[in-house]
Amino acid sequence: CIRDSSKEELEAAARRQLREILERIYREPPQYDDVIDTLFSKLPAIRDTLDTDVQAAYEGDPAATCREEVMLAYPAFEAISIFRIAHELYLMKVPMLPRMMTEYAHSLTGIDIHPGATVGPYFFIDHGTGVVIGETTVIGEHVKLYQGVTLGAKSFAVKADGTLVK
């Protein structure tokens, strides 16, 4: 029989899993506990922002029958959810993991959002295949994108041979 898990048990399990992921990725580990504590402190704000994203999708897509459908069946919401967590890790300067997370979302959904991009609340991507949002992109509030849109990577300086200056 499966019993209900308490909030504390779920958080402890999530913390253990995140620690295991960090330990597998990094030879020179960051301060695991600091990273985990900081990320968990940001989860309520991430959830609030994701709630605005669900609302934007529900209100912006006539085919959406309910908010639960958006959360469970919309690939774009999955990509945005992963991005929002990866973005916080990126801001915390956690190396590699944020990019791995958004590349995973890209492989699942066809939506490529760099973890360094800035994306405001009430964000919705409808039919998101081929959407690319680069690291330098800044997206405000109440924005809706459709398939095949590329944003960012236009502001880099280039050398005489056409290669990017990093």
Task: Describe these PLM feature segments.
Residues 3-103:
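Terminal amphipathic alpha-helical/low-complexity segments used for targeting or macromolecular assembly
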Residues 87-166:
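Flexible, glycine/small-residue-enriched loop-and-beta-strand segment within the central core
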